[in-house]
């Protein structure tokens, strides 16, 4: 498994490649890194987590590489792809950044990919999780995760826990399509049956109509993928519709019950089973050290987006 330190070295190698020359001792100009994140809007939690993680890393490791200061230029795109593309263009042309990082959702990463190829500017995807993103440009690397990575495991778990019939509910965009596709194929491979495939809009979703369809279908379980930030609203409507007492098991990717919002969900989150690549509750000494430092610096706990930053 590639470590975060190895990813850092790879990113710095891309910085050197982007500059077109080996960094010389006499060159003391700053290395500029554009950081495009959703700091406002429904994905603001993602931006807040990644920005906090970046600041923590700099505080712990310093802001110089090979004698050159690293200058991070933070820009808010509100998770709007057109804004992301415009901001990336400005960072490349006006600020002359060596690397652009961030990208809270898949459409923003894909919107910027052609610019990366044209300008030969490396992109470091810290959040967006559609599996095909890294195929959009040879200049893209990812520090986060992919939906197949976390979806196949929960499909296997369902089959081993007497779940025979399921409904899928996903957000209507790239990661949702990945989650739906890979859960469906793995669940059916294990002998399960998909009763219905439901999708909700990425922006301002109303879960009530689709949750009624779930009640009507009477599956053994409901599998859910939603982007980070929508979990609390979904869990609230899940309880309001009585699904928490209907006998339908709720299984999900970890985005739905992410650590940043879990405390706001109340008891309805008890019993939810999810699969993900990170949890702040992981008991390893390395993670405990990270969580303690993150909370001390920010007064809130990290979630899976923070480790991508």
Model-identified regions with their sequence ranges:
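Periplasmic-binding protein-like
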Residues: 91-104, 124-126, 167-170, 218-228, ...
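N-terminal secretory signal peptides and thylakoid transit peptides that target proteins
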Residues: 1-15
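Extracellular/periplasmic periplasmic-binding protein-like sensory domains
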Residues: 235-309
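Extracytoplasmic "Venus flytrap"
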Residues: 34-53, 57, 75-82, 104-107, ...
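Beta-alpha junction/loop-to-helix N-cap segments that form part of ligand/metal-binding clefts
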Residues: 45-50, 64-132, 143, 200-207, ...
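Extracellular/periplasmic Venus flytrap/periplasmic-binding protein
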Residues: 86, 130-132, 139-241, 278-289
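Signal peptide-proximal N-terminal region
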Residues: 28, 51-72, 189-192
